[in-house]
Curated annotation (Swiss-Prot):
<feature type="binding site">
    <location>
        <begin position="244"/>
        <end position="306"/>
    </location>
    <ligand>
        <name>NADP(+)</name>
    </ligand>
</feature>
<dbReference type="GO" id="GO:0047718">
    <property type="term" value="F:indanol dehydrogenase activity"/>
</dbReference>
<comment type="function">
    <text>Catalyzes the NADPH-dependent reduction of a wide variety of carbonyl-containing compounds to their corresponding alcohols. Displays enzymatic activity towards endogenous metabolites such as aromatic and aliphatic aldehydes, ketones, monosaccharides, bile acids and xenobiotics substrates. Key enzyme in the polyol pathway, catalyzes reduction of glucose to sorbitol during hyperglycemia. Reduces steroids and their derivatives and prostaglandins.</text>
</comment>
<dbReference type="GO" id="GO:0047956">
    <property type="term" value="F:glycerol dehydrogenase (NADP+) activity"/>
</dbReference>
<feature type="active site" description="Proton donor">
    <location>
        <position position="84"/>
    </location>
</feature>
<keyword id="KW-0521">NADP</keyword>
<keyword id="KW-0963">Cytoplasm</keyword>
<dbReference type="GO" id="GO:0052650">
    <property type="term" value="F:all-trans-retinol dehydrogenase (NADP+) activity"/>
</dbReference>
<dbReference type="InterPro" id="IPR036812">
    <property type="entry name" value="NADP_OxRdtase_dom_sf"/>
</dbReference>
<dbReference type="GO" id="GO:0005615">
    <property type="term" value="C:extracellular space"/>
</dbReference>
<dbReference type="GO" id="GO:0005829">
    <property type="term" value="C:cytosol"/>
</dbReference>
<dbReference type="GO" id="GO:0005739">
    <property type="term" value="C:mitochondrion"/>
</dbReference>
<dbReference type="InterPro" id="IPR018170">
    <property type="entry name" value="Aldo/ket_reductase_CS"/>
</dbReference>
<dbReference type="GO" id="GO:0047655">
    <property type="term" value="F:allyl-alcohol dehydrogenase activity"/>
</dbReference>
<comment type="similarity">
    <text>Belongs to the aldo/keto reductase family.</text>
</comment>
<dbReference type="GO" id="GO:0047939">
    <property type="term" value="F:L-glucuronate reductase activity"/>
</dbReference>
<dbReference type="GO" id="GO:0019640">
    <property type="term" value="P:D-glucuronate catabolic process to D-xylulose 5-phosphate"/>
</dbReference>
């Protein structure tokens, strides 16, 4: 699919060009200036706001306020996960804004993820119910299999043996997927998808699915543009959700001397030319690729800034510069999980 799509906004006026996306009607732009993010229409007809608030590695005690600030700033998409251990704070923020009358539940798009210790089909529903309880919600808009790799069932999020090696579950993610489909049938989730799946793993899911995944949430930034995987997913009408779009500079395992995409001189030059921040440039880059993007922040100014990316356009030349940083630079490689039969990156598969 090589559709060239040009979409015109009413206010502020600009044109955005998206290549290799497919059906023009599947990327809808809202007409209200900054009031709402554009939405991607998924293959099941459900709509996902193109910018969401990420909550990975958000400090305890700060998440509730971050969610409230985000909703006030216009965000309607919140991305969370059981393993982040802050879903209760996300729920408090959402509940507060609903009680204030700022939003209704149906205005929001809430995503969470099934953790690796709950891959066994009989555990999937109870895992979701725990998440719903923490979030104080009756349903999720989107539920993802967080990783294709199952871990040993139990209370430990990262179960290990006496030598520190991760203990695996023999469950195949295709069996987990069938249990995910039942959640849709029961009305507990509206859409289901995957995260960190490579091409072959998605193909295996599609082979058994009666409800196909609507999105693949993957690491995506200029050091890792994921062009092959994105093209494959979009050929199957699977949207992309980009995590770590700013290069995850505060990731706990970062080492001194690791490159920081926000500090790259060429990115800063583009930002200065546009009178924008480097972060806004990187978020806009994902938006122009028709990718959903979920930057994380707990800082009010940054949360608001990350949302203000709809009043400018990157030129093809600027996009070429941004993509020149591609180096297969994966920042979330899960090296300590090498050896798992379902590790998505060990064989450098896309």
């Amino acid at each position: 699919m090589n559709t060239l799509m040009k979409i015109q906004l009413v206010r502020p006026v600009f044109r955005i060009t998206l290549r290799n996306y497919g059906k023009p009607e599947r990327f809808m732009w809202c007409q209200k200036e900054y009031a709402r993010a554009p939405k991607v229409v998924c293959l099941d007809g459900n709509e996902i706001p193109v910018i969401g608030l990420g909550t990975f590695n958000s400090p305890k005690g700060q998440v509730t306020e971050a969610v409230k600030v985000a909703i006030d700033a216009g965000y309607r998409h919140i991305d969370c996960a059981y393993v982040y251990q802050n879903e209760d704070e996300v729920g408090d923020g959402v509940e507060a804004k609903i009680k204030e009358g700022v939003v209704k539940r149906e205005d929001l798009f809430i995503t969470s993820k099934l953790w690796n210790t709950f891959h066994r089909p009989d555990l999937v529903k109870s895992a979701l119910e725990n998440t719903l309880s923490s979030l104080k919600l009756k349903y999720l808009d989107l539920y993802l299999i967080h990783w294709p790799m199952g871990y040993k069932e139990g209370c430990d999020l990262f179960p290990t043996d006496k030598d520190g090696k991760t203990l695996y579950s023999p469950v195949d993610y295709v069996d987990t997927w069938k249990a995910m489909e039942k959640l849709v049938e029961e009305g507990l989730v509206k859409s289901i998808g995957v995260s960190n799946f490579n091409r072959r793993q998605i193909e295996r899911v599609l082979e058994v699915a009666t409800i196909p995944p609507v999105t693949n949430q993957i690491e995506c930034h200029p050091y890792l543009t994921q062009k092959k995987l994105i093209d494959f997913c979009k050929s199957k009408d699977i949207t992309i959700t980009a995590y770590s779009p700013l290069g995850s500079p505060n990731r706990p395992w970062a080492k001194a001397g690791d490159p920081v995409i926000l500090e790259e001189a060429k990115i800063k030059e583009i930002a200065a030319k546009k009178k924008k921040t480097p972060g806004q440039i990187l978020i806009r880059y994902q938006v122009q690729r028709a990718n959903i993007v979920i930057p994380k922040s707990v800082t009010k100014d940054r949360i608001e800034s990350n949302f203000q990316v709809f009043d400018f356009e990157l030129t093809p030349e600027e996009i070429e510069i941004i993509e020149s940083f591609e180096c297969n630079g994966r920042l979330v490689p899960l090296l300590n999980q090498y050896g798992h039969p379902h590790h998505p990156f060990e064989k450098d598969e896309y």
